[in-house]
Amino acid sequence: MSKVNDLKQENEIKIRECLYDGQIWTKNDLAYKTSLSLATTTNILQEMLKSREIEYVSDSMSTGGRKSKEYQLYKDYKHLLKIVLKKNKKSYEFIFEIIDLYDQIVYQKNYSSLKGTVEEFLKMLKEVLKKGQEIAVICLSLPGVCDQGMIDLCDFEDIQNKNILEILKKEIKQKIIIENDVNCASIGFYFVFLF
């Protein structure tokens, strides 16, 4: 039974790789691109429609037979919460952005603080998470040295020498990625300009 589930997951990944390119797809196009049967493609699309991962767009132009249905990724299926911590001359800045699957900002909130404490950060984070968005992943960019959630050197003194990942995991359920701000910029540059 495990091999059947593994094969199903592999097939779902093939379909997702196509749909996550942001284009509109027909069932026939997906079946051709992935080399999956029309029946398998239909079953996967039905499951994705039911879970609201994709949405029906329209019927495509007919070539003489029945019109094919067109599908695309549902942009609000999942969201990413991007958090940037930044120290200014006299204050600490917390920048929160909720981003949909088409890389559009659906919510943005900037906070400023004189102390920049972990407690302030958690309070702000919980407030943003209450917005009811489908946040699946939180990506935290901070000005400091980070190793598996442990912050060594950091412009936010109160966060320094603390395992911020463990602190966050106790408070929130979403997957958390923490990275140095320069590394985040490099990753972003790669995906925007080279990918």
Regions found by a protein language model. Name each.
Residues 56-80, 178-195:
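Conserved phosphate-binding catalytic cores of ATP/NTP-utilizing and phosphoryl-transfer enzymes
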Residues 105-110, 114-126, 134-194:
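Glycine-rich phosphate-binding loop and adjoining helix at the ATP-binding site
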Residues 65-106:
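Gly/Thr-rich phosphate-binding beta-strand-loop-beta motif of the actin/hexokinase/Hsp70
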Residues 4-9, 23-25, 40-43, 47, ...:
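Short glycine/proline-centered loop/turn elements that form peptide/ligand docking sites
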Residues 1-27, 31:
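Extreme N-terminal segment that seeds HTH/winged-HTH DNA-binding domains in transcriptional regulators
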